Amino acid sequence: MEKGKFIYEGKAKQLYETDDKDLVIVHYKDDATAGNGAKKGTIHNKGIMNNEITALIFNMLEEHGIKTHFVKKLNDRDQLCQRVKIFPLEVIVRNIIAGSMAKRVGIKEGTKISNTIFEICYKNDEYGDPLINDHHAVAMGLATYDELKEIYDITGKINNLLKEKFDNIGITLVDFKIEFGKNSKGEILLADEITPDTCRLWDKKTGEKLDKDRFRRDLGNIEEAYIEVVKRLTEKK
């Protein structure tokens, strides 16, 4: 299937129409950003690696009954996906305290917690993707309570599957963010991507960061970290 009219460009991906109104082509770029776009750069072949990682993970989730927008990988950088209307929300799942939460509440990064923390942010670059709660989301018309409940239910299942998957390849899933959308049938689907761009992934033995924090924090060996994630996921499908 060939790319049609250009639809949209985000920080890490481009979207194109196809000859089917319900399908789009998602193109993965090498661009990298941090701090809501304040820091910009590129990671060599990041688009290729993130396309592969998302395809592997979304296929695994589909096999376990999670409905996603993913249809198939087309080539190194492109994948065919169902067209969805995205909820303007980021759903954040925290299994260990890290990143912005550590700073926000004054708890040391790496602190283990007895429960899983779910957060939502309003996806809006102008306002810095602010943290909101369910009542804000409903009042702002971003989602209904029923939609949020379904989203949280799906997210919990995704977290359990991802934790097990990464644990089996020697990686701790610290936290991650995901997005959801509705297709033409009105079904709520997991959308966007699940990659080292959107997850915090720490090596179980060494604690080494295998994610975009290497870019955010100028830790170096960024491409190597992404390659390692691809390698482990590919070796143990």
UniProtKB/Swiss-Prot annotation:
Keyword Nucleotide-binding (UniProt): yes
Stored CDD domains: SAICAR_synt_PurC
Biochemical pathway: Purine metabolism; IMP biosynthesis via de novo pathway; 5-amino-1-(5-phospho-D-ribosyl)imidazole-4-carboxamide from 5-amino-1-(5-phospho-D-ribosyl)imidazole-4-carboxylate: step 1/2
UniProt catalytic activity: 5-amino-1-(5-phospho-D-ribosyl)imidazole-4-carboxylate + L-aspartate + ATP = (2S)-2-[5-amino-1-(5-phospho-beta-D-ribosyl)imidazole-4-carboxamido]succinate + ADP + phosphate + 2 H(+)
Biological process per Gene Ontology, one example term: cobalamin biosynthetic process
Pfam families, per database record: SAICAR_synt
GO molecular function terms attached to this record: ATP binding; phosphoribosylaminoimidazolesuccinocarboxamide synthase activity
Keywords, sorted A to Z: ATP-binding, Ligase, Nucleotide-binding, Purine biosynthesis
Entry similarity comment: Belongs to the SAICAR synthetase family.
Name of protein: Phosphoribosylaminoimidazole-succinocarboxamide synthase
Species annotation: Fusobacterium nucleatum subsp. nucleatum (strain ATCC 25586 / DSM 15643 / BCRC 10681 / CIP 101130 / JCM 8532 / KCTC 2640 / LMG 13131 / VPI 4355)
Protein encoded by which gene: purC
